[in-house]
Amino acid sequence: LAKEIGFKEIIDIGSGDGRIAFCAKVLDLESYSIEIDDMLVELQNKLITLIDFHPYCSDATIFDYSTLNLGYPAFFIGGLAQMGGNELASGVLEKIHLISDLKKTGWVFAGTTSQKYPVDSKNKSGWGTLIEKNNLNTIQSISLPTAWTFHESDETPYIFTQSLD
């Protein structure tokens, strides 16, 4: 879907194993992975022998995204809003808003409809308040099986949004 929308680069933030960056590169999109855990970055470095994407070991909220020379990126935020994802996404959004060349960006959030997590009053699978606060336009949501992501019986909704600036 990211390629269909027209995004040129994918930045996988916090997925852990770099699966989103890996899949993006398979689709011939330039891709980067930002992960704070050095052991997970070592795992990603083993994957780049198969397909060339760019893993970085860094705190995504302080990483210098201007060094990537991005054109029309989509940022995939790993982690549920209710489990630290909201803070992670807010920190990255703040960094990106400081880059004058990046006014048009995509944001993709992994959500949940599970009853065991607090509900966001604006919905969007836990991301509604953040989406509204940051003036993001929801493009589409797709649901994927969670067997390969979280230990949940529900599917994982991915909410594709875009900055309105």
Predicted features along the sequence, with ranges:
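Conserved class I S-adenosyl-L-methionine
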Residues: 7-16
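Glycine-rich SAM-binding Motif I of class I
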Residues: 18-22
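Conserved SAM-binding motif I beta-strand of class I
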Residues: 30-35
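A short SAM/SAH-binding and catalytic strip from SAM-dependent methyltransferases
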Residues: 72-90
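C-terminal substrate-binding/active-site "lid" region of AdoMet-derived donor-dependent transferases
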Residues: 87-153
